[in-house]
A protein has these predicted regions:
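Peripheral, non-catalytic segments flanking oxidoreductase cores
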Residues: 1-210
Length: 210
């Protein structure tokens, strides 16, 4: 993935959040597979961001400078054990993703849920050959709430089963300052402003938000 940045002694500490990966020696084939996966998913994410920009009647490259040459992106290989092992139905609590976009490849075991209204959850049923795509908080902020970050959670699978997924997260460079873009009047009228959550402050200076 992305190599560590070359930093001076007086560089802000948050810049050190982006560093080298630690690869398991027991799985030598993992590194080239994930590096290729990252490369392909980065291109998918950029294409989708540019499509969003056009749909918002912005220049196609409106978001390009925010992720730049050093986007903050990462991959998770996730296993959710069955409830008998965890003694809890919670796989991951309700949250929003912090970046621009996230892509989730699921196995056939359901468990991902999306909040469509306060306290109302629906299953994101796995579909073979597809990704679940979540809008993140940075897009919500950049569009003044016209695009809404997806509140989602994961419920642990039943006993004696497991759930596997691969998540890819595309974010901005750590030093990016995210503007609120000017939308055309017909879209701006529907922008509700970004949600305010005192437990999860949304800051325009990306580095200070980590």
């Amino acid at each position: 993935m992305i190599s560590a940045l070359t930093l001076s002694d007086d560089a802000p500490r948050w810049q050190r959040l982006q560093g080298p990966n630690l690869w398991p020696a027991a799985l030598p084939s993992l590194k080239p597979v994930l590096l290729h996966w990252q490369q392909q998913m980065t291109q998918v994410g950029i294409r989708l961001l540019r499509a969003f920009a056009e749909a918002l009647q912005l220049p196609e490259n409106a978001f390009d400078r925010l992720y730049g040459d050093q986007p903050n992106e990462h991959i998770k290989l996730i296993r959710y054990p069955g409830q008998q092992e965890t003694q809890s139905s919670q796989g991951v609590g309700a949250h929003k993703d912090s970046g621009f976009l996230s892509f989730l490849l699921q196995d056939e075991q359901k468990g991902l849920q999306v909040e469509v209204a306060p306290g109302q959850w629906i299953d994101a049923v796995p579909l073979a050959g597809s990704f679940v795509v979540n809008i993140g908080e940075l897009l919500e902020l950049a569009t003044n709430g016209y695009l809404r970050a997806t509140v989602h959670r994961v419920v642990s699978p039943p006993a004696q089963q497991q759930r596997l997924s691969i998540a890819f997260f595309l974010g901005a460079q750590l030093d990016a300052v995210v503007p609120v873009y000017t939308l055309p009047p017909e879209l701006a009228r529907e922008a509700r402003g970004p949600d305010s959550d005192p437990h999860n402050p949304l800051l325009r200076d990306v580095g200070w938000n980590y």
